[in-house]
């Protein structure tokens, strides 16, 4: 089997691409980074360093090559040849690749290819593949829409693996370092044709429970560790979470967001408490050097209505659950400053010019005046 994977960055190589290759697939990475693509084409393999309490080893990933995703003709040709398409490009890039996907699907169908094809976006967002499908359909010729609905599966997924950036290795410049833990859960109800047998890909018919469990716990906790750690003067996630006051705050935030999950999906409280502890331990992994600015980047996206801070807060409001720590976490996110991050600069500018209340309303889209006032007060008393 052959897979086309968009995004040859650390997540693509260290997580999704590795699982596909480990399952015997030939993996073609598509990316705009010429140097990475040239290395993939010439070396046809790379190393993945897996680190944790009980493991510190390098595994080779083979049967890989690359294509420049700006080469639309090559991408369209590959869409007709492959059995699976995956992405790990970041939520903002899905809009950009959608027009190429539309052209490629039109060409595949126009050429008489009636084999089903599944597309899985492996992004840090809720129902990222459904979003990609919407974007693709805005570019799709109406004459092809019925056939695309019939033959192309747009499969939502939840992904979880911490893959921090590392300095390139001189001998193996494609080497990527990852934590031992990984989780890739896909919505089995959305596949067309046979579901591919991929080691490490779990199937579920209740994906939203796992999407929100990850978003409300790993993503919420990671962001809060970053924002509060930065606020306290730390540079790395590991040193932030080793500060007992940071750890206690992050845990209390995850407990509040966890109460929403328990109420909404019936998760076992003890099992979820253990899941929180496992995540706190992952943040403290001594082998992962993860910068708070990498984790905290794009604060406006992370403060948006359906993302890791506001969505769990909305759940606490819906169910009448405690949320003092989530309120404080959002206030801490508002304090994030980074001269190299356009969103952080925009956030600081809005706070200075429009004030905290209008900034909260604009970027979070919250309507509840009392909740907005509580966030504003928490921000002003940081």
Curated annotation (Swiss-Prot):
It catalyses: D-mannitol 1-phosphate + NAD(+) = beta-D-fructose 6-phosphate + NADH + H(+). Keywords: NAD, Oxidoreductase. InterPro entries: 6-PGluconate_DH-like_C_sf, 6PGD_dom2, Mannitol_1_phos_5_DH, Mannitol_DH, Mannitol_DH_C, Mannitol_DH_CS, Mannitol_DH_N, NAD(P)-bd_dom_sf. Its EC number is 1.1.1.17. It comes from the Bacteria. GO terms for cellular component: cytosol. Transmembrane segments: none annotated. GO terms for biological process: mannitol catabolic process. It holds the Pfam family Mannitol_dh. NAD(+) binds at residues 3-14. Coiled coil: none annotated. GO terms for molecular function: mannitol-1-phosphate 5-dehydrogenase activity. NCBIfam families: PRK02318.1-2, PRK02318.1-3, PRK02318.2-2, PRK02318.2-5. Belongs to the mannitol dehydrogenase family. This is Mannitol-1-phosphate 5-dehydrogenase. It comes from Mannheimia succiniciproducens (strain KCTC 0769BP / MBEL55E).
